[in-house]
Amino acid sequence: MTNIRKTHPLIKIVNHSFIDLPAPSNISAWWNFGSLLGLCLAIQILTGLFLAMHYTSDTMTAFSSVTHICRDVNYGWLIRYMHANGASMFFICLFLHVGRGLYYGSYIYFETWNIGVILLFVVMATAFMGYVLPWGQMSFWGATVITNLLSAIPYIGAXXVEWIWGGFSVDKATLTRFFAFHFILPFIIAALTMVHLLFLHETGSNNPLGLVSDSDKVPFHPYYTIKDILGVLLLILALMTLILFSPDLLGDPDNYTPANPLSTPPHIKPEWYFLFAYAILRSIPNKLGGVLALAFSILILMLFPLLHLSKQRSMMFRPLSQCVFWILVADLFTLTWIGGQPVEYPFIVIGQLASILYFTIILLILPTASLIENKLLKW
């Protein structure tokens, strides 16, 4: 009798994706983040579902309902903090996953890469809308500031902002629609993830050497299932340590104050994972210019397949490009730090320099380094 795993229409799909999938024999721990992102998404959908059972999306009761979840619901505090800190873990895994793709040239599979960039955008939109839901001070003012950016669009800007708000300011209509979108988007993310994997499995995984690995494949199970389980355990350990020891480490104290349209917090800033983009936005004095720079700071990822001028795929044997890559990483850390600082003398200049460096490295220095390496290798 033929194995049901290989004949049943549904189980066959799972088999070809997670069991009998041919995988390169040398992929490192940097390839674990895909499965960890899947785990993060599952955690977020499950905890989010239980939070939605107790949350009310009304301006009068939203803040109280979150308090109620933390105080009165059985293990509500745990579910709430798993959801909030799960988002941080999600973004840590996302940034490492994208960084791995940049370092090892995974963007050469451009369908997989571009769907990944779209996924990044959708996850960022979901996280932003989720941050508005507790209706604290930073929720309200964050929503006001970020939605207001659309007013920079010529001619239709002002009308578009009021359309998104559902009124003349961030209010009940805004909160309700953000809750609706925040609920539906994770399922859209899950669907896009399937497409992401579909395209990946058309070509097979890249590997650290950036070479074709068809001659040396191993089955995904048991080799990479056991490896993924180790990653999963480490992620859960890190997440639970964060939740149980310092759940508010990455949050903003202002969000424990109920939203008040009449009092603006001294420093409006988003969650830590948006700070690098926020710093780029703030470093340009012109509103429209800032918004364009903000959008382009993520969209620029889609240009990587076009900017790849090296004859080698991976950076593993390209010391010059490696050096530039790590400068880019340091620059992103600098931008993240600047995004959380007030807009005053030293920070403004540092932010502007870091923003210029970010775009210069990607558009100019990395391609130039690739050409120099080609020349040095007489290629």
Curated annotation (Swiss-Prot):
Source domain of life: Eukaryota
InterPro entries from the UniProt entry: Cyt_b/b6_C, Cyt_b/b6_C_sf, Cyt_b/b6_N, Cytb/b6-like_sf, Cytochrome_b, Cytochrome_b_C_euk/bac, Cytochrome_b_N_euk/bac, Di-haem_cyt_TM
A GO BP entry: mitochondrial electron transport, ubiquinol to cytochrome c
Quaternary data: The cytochrome bc1 complex contains 11 subunits: 3 respiratory subunits (MT-CYB, CYC1 and UQCRFS1), 2 core proteins (UQCRC1 and UQCRC2) and 6 low-molecular weight proteins (UQCRH/QCR6, UQCRB/QCR7, UQCRQ/QCR8, UQCR10/QCR9, UQCR11/QCR10 and a cleavage product of UQCRFS1). This cytochrome bc1 complex then forms a dimer.
Any GO CC annotation of this UniProt entry: respiratory chain complex III
Cofactor note: Binds 2 heme b groups non-covalently.
Note: Heme 1 (or BL or b562) is low-potential and absorbs at about 562 nm, and heme 2 (or BH or b566) is high-potential and absorbs at about 566 nm.
Protein name (record): Cytochrome b
A GO term, aspect molecular function: ubiquinol-cytochrome-c reductase activity
PROSITE patterns: CYTB_CTER (PS51003), CYTB_NTER (PS51002)
